[in-house]
């Protein structure tokens, strides 16, 4: 049992150091990329929704 005590101490020290240093290393990450600007697809989708509502209204009033 005495032979297993030395590697377990090394493992314990390694785990403790890792737990302490891991959050420090992650806190220095680079800032996130800025949000992308509109590429036109949202505008196209908005126009498509408006046209669908107009078509629905026309269909409702014709019948």
Curated annotation (Swiss-Prot):
The protein's name: Arabinogalactan protein 22
Residue ranges of the propeptide: 39-63
Organism from which the protein derives: Arabidopsis thaliana
GO cellular component, one term: plasma membrane
Role: Proteoglycan that seems to be implicated in diverse developmental roles such as differentiation, cell-cell recognition, embryogenesis and programmed cell death.
Family: Belongs to the AG-peptide AGP family.
Signal peptide (from-to): 1-27
Lineage: Eukaryota, Viridiplantae, Streptophyta, Embryophyta, Tracheophyta
Residues where 4-hydroxyproline is found: 32, 34, 36
């Amino acid at each position: 049992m005495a032979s297993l005590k030395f590697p377990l101490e090394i493992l314990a020290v390694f785990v403790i150091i890792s737990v302490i240093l891991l959050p420090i290393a992650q806190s220095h990450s680079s800032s996130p990329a800025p949000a992308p600007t509109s590429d036109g697809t949202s505008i196209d989708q908005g126009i498509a929704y408006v046209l669908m509502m107009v078509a629905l209204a026309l269909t409702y009033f014709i019948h």
